[in-house]
């Protein structure tokens, strides 16, 4: 059987899809169409009519999906869907997982007797680090020589809202067959990473000059200049802060507000950022979340509310 695959448009979503593709291929199945999805969710998600059997990973639940795996606490679009949801071997949700990639791997092994290649285990452990922000130090988090960091960066910046599915398809296919360390050396990955690397120093300088402190929270407006996104730069320059709020501009002229907590100095309040951003139709995890806006004015207003 051939399935349409819906996946979150980041490294975790792509890796989750790759593991599923390897599993499906072992049964003589595969993917038909590739659909990269992102937050905020369009209003028609609940009414979406799938034309083919569908798999969804690292994204919102939909009861019509044949397979669904996710680890986001904000996985259910409606209270009714959450109330009526039942865990099965085909539909599984566990917000305790740092990455959806690791969740998919574990469930396929346990419920379908999947025999994965050894490199999938290493992939899952690295996704726990990158998606769960559990690096051993700020130095490791900022080490762009690491293959996993380079892979993750290839989906960031101006590529975050990319509509061309070819790159996603290429990487999912490649990750399903070989180690992510080998995939990171592909010309397409390196081209994206090199573009990021060229702007790294100027981006660091921009962050150092433009980070604004509000007690234990830092704010940076990245929409005013074309800079590389540096998720941990605020904690690099100001290691004692608890939160960083980012305002970003995307290729489609939309804006987003991202909020993260310091992985090396967690705030005592333990505010759930993903749930907090649901008021703006966003989502995320305990320590990181994002919401999108049509205008900069709306994004700035939300950023100020978040900082308060």
Give, region by region, the residue ranges found by the protein language model.
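Long, charge-rich alpha-helical interaction segments
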Residues: 152-191
């Amino acid at each position: 059987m051939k399935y349409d695959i819906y996946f979150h448009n980041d490294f975790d979503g792509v890796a989750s899809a790759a593991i599923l593709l390897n599993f499906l291929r072992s049964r003589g199945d595969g993917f038909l169409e590739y659909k990269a999805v992102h937050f905020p969710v369009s209003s028609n998600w609940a009414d979406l009519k799938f034309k083919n059997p569908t798999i969804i990973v690292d994204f919102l639940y939909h009861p019509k999906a044949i397979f669904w795996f996710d680890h986001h606490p904000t996985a259910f679009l409606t209270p009714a869907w959450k109330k009526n949801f039942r865990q099965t071997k085909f539909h599984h949700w566990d917000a305790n997982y740092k990455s959806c990639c690791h969740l998919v791997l574990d469930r396929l092994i346990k419920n379908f007797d999947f025999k994965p290649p050894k490199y999938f285990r290493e992939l899952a452990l690295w996704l726990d680090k990158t998606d769960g922000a559990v690096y051993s130090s700020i130095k490791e988090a900022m080490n762009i020589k690491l293959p996993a960091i380079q892979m993750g960066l290839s989906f960031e910046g101006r590529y975050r809202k990319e509509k061309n599915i070819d790159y996603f398809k290429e990487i999912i296919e490649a990750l399903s067959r070989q180690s992510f360390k080998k995939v990171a050396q592909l010309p397409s990955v390196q081209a994206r990473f090199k573009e990021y690397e060229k702007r790294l120093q100027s981006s660091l300088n921009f962050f150092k000059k433009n980070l604004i402190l509000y007690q234990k929270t830092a704010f940076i407006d990245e929409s005013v200049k074309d800079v590389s996104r540096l998720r941990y730069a605020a904690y690099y320059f100001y290691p004692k802060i608890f939160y960083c709020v980012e305002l970003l501009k995307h290729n489609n002229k939309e804006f987003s507000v991202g909020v993260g907590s310091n992985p090396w100095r967690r705030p005592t309040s333990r505010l759930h950022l993903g749930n907090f951003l649901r008021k703006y139709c966003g989502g995320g995890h305990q320590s990181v979340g994002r919401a999108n806006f049509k205008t900069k004015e709306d994004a700035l207003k939300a950023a100020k509310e978040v900082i308060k």
